């Protein structure tokens, strides 16, 4: 009985790759230094899987930035602005595409399906000359082979690559990307040929777009692609891997009939309906890679339940064709529990990170083969039972309060236009008010202070003094820049979710539970293991302190319930919406306390609202209903003069704009600059929006400093579709990851651009 891993985290157990990348970008280390760290990480991952007994070990799931970018470089799909002259793509071109450079902007980055990982969006069109320009997949296969590990090279499948791309600038928006299939398949054939020549016997194509609602012509592209590749794939075993959701019934038929394919991988954690499809019929003689171990969460698998599922499949697939696998790449979970010595022992017994999931996969495969490790299974059963019965999981008062929310509407009593009038009388803001999204750069000194306070190396008084000094600097800087609505910069916060989770009951935290978000950026999601409540105020002291330093409005800064939910590892023993309602009630208590403390502008970030949207349209309405309801719960009951802002990230909002309007926030700021004003098209199409809105005027994910003219041009584009009296001027996102040398001139240019347009508007009257 065989075992398989879809993919594995790249960053390393202690984020070794992150630090190596950032050192290289800062010119503190060489390309060779970076390559050495990467090679050591790959080697240790392959060895770890081989030692654990995994039969089908993946290669080419490592990346210096992103696997879709790797595929674009493999195909030589480099936008002209990066001046790629042909040959093998090196770090300069690769990282310019990912991050931009002094003279050209980065490519767009967007969410990878409904996860918190981001991929670089390929820019394609009829003029792209595809060529085999990165031999990474073959090189990594050979590298593993030299170490004595025979791996399964993994490629993003050709159809998924095209479906995740976008038409390049200057190409018609309606350009049929799938028409490029004939142009990219010759490159795939070259790669496959080289892998075969190097000795590969298996190859994995990741085609996760198969779980989406696809149109018939899109489905036909899969049939066409694999028919075209069939002769090249001859002599290889081929896995087509899917993940993140159920496979639609029609898609299942097409997928399981693909030519040249030996095995199919399915997510059986999020795909219970797929299980029914398999039981209804599976192609004879094909392998089933059964994704029963959850790759997206940190809970130990219920091994008895997984084994039962696998046993039910044995009769359908055949014992020798059933392979135990993860539900998706382990990229989306933390790396190794061994690095968590301080985690509460009981909670720790309920968990499994990537390294432990590899062991679970192998234990299930051995159990199926009649070599069940009884002690391992008993220990797992005891942990499952302890989690079900632990008193720390349940709080009856919280359960009751959350249950009472169902079915009610919870909406502020007056309309948004009436509230905006009342707020303007109180705040007296200029036309095109300027603000920032919340965080300011976190210097090494600031991080040191927080670290030492956490380690009890400095006193609380010293810590408070240091944070107050930092807030004072940030307030002073914003006043000097003449920003209208200020923020305190969040110097006390390590992370916008962890900071709140640390002060809420029902949350646990890891020391090294890092997960890659994009590039070198990692997040450390909290673990929601029990019912959530707020024992004490969380932000009031710092917001009040900051407001006392200025006469200008100071925003209270909170993270919204849906974002806390979507950016945490969430308990899987109750529906997600129940946990979300509990968090909403905790945030509501905080909002009320901020208002009482004299904070007139409160931002409740819902950066991840869109990200939680189920992949299939049939499930959208239910999710949006409870997600939007949860947000509205947080700001009831407030005075009309209290202005509620919300902020959203990386999102294509056009399909959910009516739900966003239904959130009933007074002002919404949205990341917009990297998506070439995609958001504005919604308003061009006549959607009426009466609340304040601030589409980001510059990209904070790039070190590039935009000019006043560039920002003014962006504002003018916005004014072409939005009323002057509702438009706000702000960056895309928080400034935490940037340096002050980048932030000061960028904000200076932003304020200058707003003033320039104000003057033009005044003289045009």
Curated annotation (Swiss-Prot):
Pathway: Amino-acid biosynthesis; L-methionine biosynthesis via de novo pathway; L-methionine from L-homocysteine (MetE route): step 1/1. Has an absolute requirement for a polyglutamylated folate as substrate. Its main location: cytoplasm. GO terms for cellular component: cytoplasm. Its EC number is 2.1.1.14. InterPro entries: Cbl-indep_Met_Synth_N, Cobalamin-indep_Met_synthase, Met_Synth_C/arc, UROD/MetE-like_sf. It is found in: Cytoplasm. This is 5-methyltetrahydropteroyltriglutamate--homocysteine methyltransferase. It comes from Catharanthus roseus. Disulfide bonds: none annotated. NCBIfam families: met_syn_B12ind, PRK05222.1.
């Amino acid at each position: 009985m065989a075992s398989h891993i879809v993919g594995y985290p790249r960053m390393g157990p202690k984020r070794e790759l992150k630090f190596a990348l950032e050192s290289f970008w800062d010119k503190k280390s060489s390309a060779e230094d970076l390559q050495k760290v990467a090679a050591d990480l790959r080697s240790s991952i392959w060895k770890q899987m081989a030692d654990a007994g995994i039969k089908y070990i993946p290669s080419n799931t490592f990346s210096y930035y992103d696997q879709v970018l790797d595929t674009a470089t493999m195909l030589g799909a480099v936008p002209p602005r990066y001046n790629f002259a042909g040959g093998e793509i090196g770090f300069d071109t690769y990282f310019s595409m990912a991050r931009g450079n002094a003279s050209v902007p980065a490519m767009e980055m967007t969410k990878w399906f409904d996860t918190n990982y981001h991929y670089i969006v390929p820019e394609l069109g009829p003029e792209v000359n595809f060529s085999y320009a990165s031999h990474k997949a073959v090189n990594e296969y050979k590298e593993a082979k030299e170490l004595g590990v025979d791996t399964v090279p993994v490629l993003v499948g050709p159809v998924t690559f095209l479906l995740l791309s976008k038409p390049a600038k200057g190409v018609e928006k309606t350009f049929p990307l799938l028409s490029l299939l004939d142009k990219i398949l010759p490159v795939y054939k070259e790669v496959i040929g080289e892998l075969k020549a190097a000795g590969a016997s298996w190859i994995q194509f990741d085609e996760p777009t198969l779980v989406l609602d696809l149109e018939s012509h899109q489905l036909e592209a899969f049939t066409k692609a694999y028919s075209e590749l069939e002769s090249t794939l001859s002599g290889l075993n081929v896995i087509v891997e899917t993940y993140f959701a159920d496979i639609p019934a029609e898609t299942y038929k097409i997928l399981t009939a693909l030519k040249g394919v030996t095995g199919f991988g399915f997510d059986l954690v999020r795909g219970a309906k797929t299980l029914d499809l398999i039981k209804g019929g599976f192609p004879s003689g094909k392998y089933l890679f059964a994704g029963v171990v959850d790759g997206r969460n940190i809970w130990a698998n219920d091994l008895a339940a997984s084994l039962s599922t696998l046993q039910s499949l044995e009769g359908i697939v055949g014992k020798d064709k059933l392979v135990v696998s993860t539900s998706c790449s382990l990229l989306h979970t933390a790396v190794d529990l061994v690095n968590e010595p301080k985690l509460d022992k009981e909670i720790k017994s309920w968990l499994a990170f990537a390294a432990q999931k590899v062991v679970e996969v192998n234990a299930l495969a051995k159990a199926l083969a009649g070599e069940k490790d009884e002690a391992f299974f008993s220990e797992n059963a005891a942990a499952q039972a302890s989690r079900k019965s632990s008193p720390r999981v349940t709080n009856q008062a919280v359960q009751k309060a959350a249950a009472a929310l169902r079915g009610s509407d919870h909406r502020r009593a007056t309309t948004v236009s009436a509230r905006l009038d009342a707020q303007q009388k109180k705040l007296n803001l200029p036309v095109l008010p300027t603000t920032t999204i919340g965080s300011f750069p976190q210097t090494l000194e600031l991080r040191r202070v927080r670290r030492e306070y956490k380690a009890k190396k400095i006193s609380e008084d010293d810590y408070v003094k240091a944070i107050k000094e930092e807030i004072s600097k940030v307030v002073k800087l914003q006043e000097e820049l003449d920003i209208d609505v200020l923020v305190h910069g969040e110097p006390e916060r390590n992370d916008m979710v962890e900071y709140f989770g640390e002060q809420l009951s029902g949350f646990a935290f890891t020391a090294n539970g890092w997960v890659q978000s994009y590039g070198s950026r990692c997040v450390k999601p909290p673990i929601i293991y029990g019912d959530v409540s707020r024992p004490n105020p969380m932000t009031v002291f710092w917001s009040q302190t900051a407001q006392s330093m200025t006469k200008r409005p100071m925003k209270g800064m909170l993270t919204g319930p849906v974002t806390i939910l979507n950016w945490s590892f969430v308990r899987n023993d109750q529906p997600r919406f129940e946990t979300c309602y509990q968090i909403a009630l905790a945030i509501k208590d905080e909002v009320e306390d901020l208002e009482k403390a004299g904070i007139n502008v409160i931002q409740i970030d819902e950066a991840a609202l869109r990200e939680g949207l189920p992949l299939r349209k049939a499930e959208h309405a239910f999710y949006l209903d409870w997600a939007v309801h949860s947000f509205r719960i947080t700001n009831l009951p407030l005075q009309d003069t209290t202005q509620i802002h919300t902020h959203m990230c990386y999102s294509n909002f056009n399909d959910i704009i009516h739900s966003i309007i239904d959130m009933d926030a007074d002002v919404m700021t949205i990341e917009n600059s990297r998506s070439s004003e995609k958001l504005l098209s919604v308003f061009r199409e006549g959607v009426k929006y009466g609340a304040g809105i601030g589409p980001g005027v510059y990209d904070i994910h790039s070190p590039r400093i935009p000019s006043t003219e560039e920002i003014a041009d962006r504002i003018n584009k916005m004014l072409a579709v939005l009323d002057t009296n509702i438009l706000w001027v702000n960056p895309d996102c928080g400034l935490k990851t940037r340096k002050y040398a980048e932030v000061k001139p960028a904000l200076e240019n932003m304020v200058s651009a707003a003033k320039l347009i104000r003057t033009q508007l005044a003289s045009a009257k």
